[in-house]
């Protein structure tokens, strides 16, 4: 990678962020596509957020990725947000287009691109049951609604149920999607909804410890159920291990990470990311952990 006076910058902004795999993904893509760009990680306090966004235009950057805890906080400083970002209420990609800052959310797109690529799954006219109501879950729910899902069942913690219901109502009113919200503590209801679902998603952090899962070993799955977990470290959570032991298709969150990045890269550069090459490198890295 040759850095010169014409090199353009992209970055991921969050706190903490030094652990991010995004610089590896995007710098690999810049090098392989021959684009004169560099991608770095900026760990900044919220008090510096507005000036950081101004610097996108000041330095003629491609744009930036936004991670927690700033996905909502950046929205007032943007000139425009896309339909998906507006539905989700969060932005993960900002594009510098002709001096205007446009906010996108590529998380939901990345999730369903992963399912389509690795499991040949299309969410249109399908029934989904999803565990979780946070940022990743909301992105998946909104994208599923945009893509024409028939029914979406959301299970979230009782403490956040009213907030989740309000968000679901907003998404439903703007897309026409049928959405219901239930307490995640009600395992019997989860079982009931999963038995009539086409897709079952864990969008919580339960399983990151490599030991825990929300459902139990006696849980029943319908044949041909597609299963996904947004977690990618560990590479196989107890949840995924259980469903694979029953012979079901299942994917982890690494593909979502890659394809949300690929969508951002294409928005910035107009070039397609060499996703297959990068996937092989990521798989090697995380399978060994």
UniProtKB/Swiss-Prot annotation:
* Active site annotation, chain numbering: 71
The reaction(s) annotated as catalysed by this protein in its Swiss-Prot or TrEMBL entry are: shikimate + NADP(+) = 3-dehydroshikimate + NADPH + H(+)
> What are this entry's molecular-function GO terms?
NADP binding; shikimate 3-dehydrogenase (NADP+) activity
Biological processes annotated in GO = amino acid biosynthetic process; aromatic amino acid family biosynthetic process; chorismate biosynthetic process; shikimate metabolic process
Coiled coil start-end:
none
Alphabetized NCBIfam families for the sequence: aroE, PRK00258.2-4
Q: What is this protein called?
A: Shikimate dehydrogenase (NADP(+))
Q: Which gene encodes it?
A: aroE
């Amino acid at each position: 990678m040759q850095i010169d006076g014409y090199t353009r910058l992209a970055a991921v902004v969050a706190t903490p962020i030094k652990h991010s795999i995004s610089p590896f993904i995007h710098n690999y893509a810049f090098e392989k596509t021959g684009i004169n760009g560099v991608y770095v990680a900026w760990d900044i306090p919220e008090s510096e957020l507005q000036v950081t966004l101004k610097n996108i235009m000041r330095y003629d950057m491609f744009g930036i990725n936004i991670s927690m805890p700033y996905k909502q906080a950046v929205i007032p400083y943007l000139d425009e947000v896309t339909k998906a970002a507006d539905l989700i209420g969060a932005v993960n990609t900002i594009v510098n287009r002709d001096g205007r800052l446009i906010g996108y959310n590529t998380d939901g797109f990345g999730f369903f691109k992963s399912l389509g690529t690795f499991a040949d799954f299309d969410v249109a006219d399908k029934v989904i049951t999803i565990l979780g109501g946070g940022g990743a879950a909301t992105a998946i729910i909104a994208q599923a609604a945009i893509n024409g899902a028939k029914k979406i069942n959301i299970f979230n913690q009782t403490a956040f149920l009213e907030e989740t219901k309000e968000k679901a109502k907003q998404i439903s009113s703007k897309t026409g999607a049928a959405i219901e919200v239930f307490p995640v503590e009600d395992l019997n209801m989860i079982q009931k909804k999963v038995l009539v679902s086409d897709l079952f998603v864990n969008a919580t952090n339960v399983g990151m410890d490599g030991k825990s899962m929300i459902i139990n070993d006696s849980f029943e799955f319908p044949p041909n159920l597609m299963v996904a977990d947004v977690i990618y470290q560990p590479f196989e959570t107890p949840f995924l291990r259980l469903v694979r032991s029953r012979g079901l298709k299942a994917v982890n969150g690494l593909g979502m990470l890659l394809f949300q990045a690929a969508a951002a890269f294409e928005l910035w550069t107009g070039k397609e990311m060499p996703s297959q090459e990068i996937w092989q490198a990521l798989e090697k890295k995380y399978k060994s952990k």
